[in-house]
């Protein structure tokens, strides 16, 4: 898979300084691109080659001239060495002639071993005997003292265990490599043999034909071909070839990395071009590179499986690695950047408060590694090493998504949204009010670039990005209040009343407060809490009411304490509130479960209201739909779920199912509720 990176970056000069978002043109971002190599899915989009400027061409020409000068100096030095007197005398010595031994035949089972593998394994007893012999040989006191210390060390149990581990690893490392397959079409070969044997009537030929037709042999040949096909796709790279290739990079620190990569596990690394070099830009969580811990950001790739990489375009690197699996041998120049060892990162779970599509984002480092999500999705963030681009999985996709995806970091998203809002305010004239938008008197304010460290109120009120979440399972004796939200005539009041009527022992409503006088048949504490206007206004000032209003010069309201009384009784508190009350409710300790009751299509809504004997005008229906959009846009981050009320009976059953699920399954709630 090919991914391209248009590196719109955020500069952070210090904690106290203003952070700026680079909103450069897409053409400018074409110069800074990454490509993710060997990633899952048919997502490859080729990257247009980057045109080098005249300055870059001059630098490249200078590098080529320096290389040629080094080659000429090396040849001159070699000529000087070849002309030395000592080499001339050595050249006059006749070469030694070997003797042919006709009695030696390697085909009779004797295998010549390379001196590289002829390693003698020393046992602990041999080491002890050697030290004893040395102790008797050396007579001075200092040597005797040193030998005594060594003997004590050899007799130590920990040393003996370490010695055994060393020997075991040595034996394993010097084992011969497994045999390399000669063919990958054993099945075809067996079929060809059977064709040849058809006209043959010898007993041995018939036995061989019957043997090749047995299910076990056919299964064996099939397995052989599958394994051989995988092994033969990559030519084995021997140590001699690797070390021979390193010689051309003399003077540079080079490391060799071998990674075992299965066919179904992507490599999980992005690369970029820096002049002729191919540099590892990013290591993605979940890939073979991250699991091995051997590739690092900033490493320059010189070779992969003996193929030279320096000078190649990232598209060529993508094509090269597209189908590679098995043992990958990298020759690298390690990054010069000294990074502290990565701390063990804690996974955080966040709820997204905005929609994101990486294909529409010109600043995503790796477009095809970008993770799309919708408002309300839960993301599991596993890496914040790059503060601008987090690595995350979407809830429910962990098993189907081998690599983590890239999502905008919270600070980065807040910064560019603030910049967009500033630009839009400068460009757009004040519009006339619409059905869903009341006019506001804009206060004059000093325009400053957004600073995440100083504008907490600005974040919370205007720029919604992510909210950290935790799983919460409600206790059996402390039920979460159920809040129904929706525009008028969408059925939330009918659904609430049906629940109250059908299951009176399970659901209850909070007793409201009022300043009006008690009427006959009304019971204080059951129908209303009757209080004075002065006490009511004092409670408003103290923030004790979830919502309140005035009707016929009397104040009415629902208090947090009234809801808490229902919860303490063991029942489920049912409330139907306005959206303006949600912030106060969420900031309380009540842990509400908020369900948005949305209307169906305009035609279906007209039919539902007609059943109730209502005949709304077309503009009234449009106003309900627009009000729904406004509520979702401005308050959707408060909603836990939504129900489209296209049929009241079905909506009731769905509402009951969601409420019952709170007893059996943990739910995601803001982490601040559990602290």
From Swiss-Prot:
Sequence positions bearing Phosphoserine: 14, 25, 83-84
Highest rank taxon of the organism: Eukaryota
Region span, Interaction with LIN7C: 181-243
Cysteine pairings via disulfide bonds: none
Segments forming domain Guanylate kinase-like: 479-660
Region annotated Required for the correct localization of PALS1 and PATJ at cell-cell contacts and the normal formation of tight junctions and adherens junctions, chain positions: 1-345
Membrane-topology descriptor: Peripheral membrane protein
GO BP terms, alphabetized: central nervous system neuron development; cerebral cortex development; regulation of transforming growth factor beta receptor signaling pathway
Keywords noted in UniProt: ATP-binding, Cell junction, Cell membrane, Cell projection, Golgi apparatus, Membrane, Nucleotide-binding, Phosphoprotein, Repeat, SH3 domain, Tight junction
SUPFAM superfamilies in UniProt: L27 domain (SSF101288), P-loop containing nucleoside triphosphate hydrolases (SSF52540), PDZ domain-like (SSF50156), SH3-domain (SSF50044)
Name of this protein: Protein PALS1
């Amino acid at each position: 898979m090919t991914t391209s990176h248009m590196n719109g970056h955020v500069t952070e000069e210090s904690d106290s300084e203003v952070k700026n978002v680079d909103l450069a043109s897409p053409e400018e971002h074409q110069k800074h691109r990454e490509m993710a190599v060997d990633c899952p899915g048919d997502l490859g989009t080729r990257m247009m080659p980057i045109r080098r400027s005249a300055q870059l061409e001059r630098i490249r020409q200078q590098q080529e001239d320096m290389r040629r000068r080094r080659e000429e100096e090396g040849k001159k030095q070699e000529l000087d060495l070849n002309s030395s007197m000592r080499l001339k005398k050595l050249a006059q010595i006749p070469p030694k002639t070997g003797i042919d031994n006709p009695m030696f035949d390697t085909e009779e089972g004797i295998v010549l071993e390379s001196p590289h593998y002829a390693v003698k394994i020393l046992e602990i007893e041999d080491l002890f005997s050697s030290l004893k012999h040395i102790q008797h040989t050396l007579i001075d006191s200092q040597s005797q003292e040193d030998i005594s210390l060594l003997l004590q060390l050899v007799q130590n149990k920990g040393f003996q265990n370490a010695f055994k581990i060393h020997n075991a690893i040595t034996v394993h490392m010097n084992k011969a490599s497994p045999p390399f397959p000669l063919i990958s079409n054993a099945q075809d070969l067996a079929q060809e043999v059977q064709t040849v044997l058809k006209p043959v009537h010898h007993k041995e030929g018939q036995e061989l034909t019957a043997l090749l037709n047995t299910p076990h042999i056919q299964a064996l040949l099939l397995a052989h071909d599958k394994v051989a096909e995988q092994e033969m796709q990559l030519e084995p790279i021997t140590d001699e070839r690797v070390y021979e290739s390193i010689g051309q990079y003399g003077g540079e620190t080079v490391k060799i990395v071998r990674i075992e990569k299965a066919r179904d596990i992507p490599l999980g690394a992005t690369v970029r071009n820096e002049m002729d070099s191919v540099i590892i830009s990013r290591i993605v969580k979940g890939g073979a590179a991250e699991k091995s811990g051997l590739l690092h950001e900033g490493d320059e790739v010189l070779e992969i499986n003996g193929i030279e990489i320096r000078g190649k375009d990232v598209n060529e690197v993508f094509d090269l690695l597209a189908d590679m699996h098995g043992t990958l041998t990298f020759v690298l120049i390690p990054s010069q950047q000294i990074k502290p060892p990565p701390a063990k990162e804690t996974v955080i779970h966040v709820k997204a408060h905005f929609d994101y599509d990486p294909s529409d984002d010109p600043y995503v480092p790796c477009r095809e590694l970008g993770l799309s999500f919708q408002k309300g999705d839960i993301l599991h963030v596993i890496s914040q090493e790059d503060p601008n681009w987090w690595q995350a999985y979407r809830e429910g996709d962990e098993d189907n998504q081998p690599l983590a995806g890239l999502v905008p970091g919270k600070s980065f998203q807040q910064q560019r949204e603030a910049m967009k809002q500033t630009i839009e305010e400068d460009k757009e004239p004040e519009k006339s009010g619409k059905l869903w938008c009341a006019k506001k008197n804009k206060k004059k304010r000093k325009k400053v670039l957004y600073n995440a460290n100083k504008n907490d109120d600005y974040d919370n009120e205007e720029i919604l990005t992510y909210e950290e979440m935790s799983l919460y399972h409600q206790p059996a004796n402390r039920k979460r209040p159920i809040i129904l939200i929706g525009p008028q005539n969408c059925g939330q009041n009918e659904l609430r009343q049906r629940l109250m009527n059908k299951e009176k022992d399970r659901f209850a409503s909070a007793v409201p407060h009022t300043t009006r006088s008690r009427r006959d048949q009304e019971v204080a504490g059951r129908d209303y809490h009757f209080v004075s206007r002065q006490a009511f206004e004092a409670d408003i000032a103290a923030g004790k009411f979830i919502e309140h209003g005035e009707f016929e010069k009397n104040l009415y309201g629902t208090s947090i304490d009234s809801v808490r009384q229902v919860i303490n009784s063991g029942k489920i508190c049912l409330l139907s509130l306005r959206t303006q009350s949600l912030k106060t409710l969420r900031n309380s300790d009540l842990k509400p479960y908020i369900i948005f009751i949305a209307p169906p299509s305009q035609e279906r809504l007209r039919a539902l209201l007609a059943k109730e004997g209502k005949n709304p005008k077309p503009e009234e229906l449009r106003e309900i739909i627009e009000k729904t959009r406004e509520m979702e846009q401005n308050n959707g981050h408060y909603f836990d779920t939504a129900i489209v009320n296209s049929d009241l009976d079905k909506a009731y059953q769905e509402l009951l199912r969601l409420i019952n699920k709170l007893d059996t399954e943990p739910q995601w709630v803001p982490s601040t509720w559990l602290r």
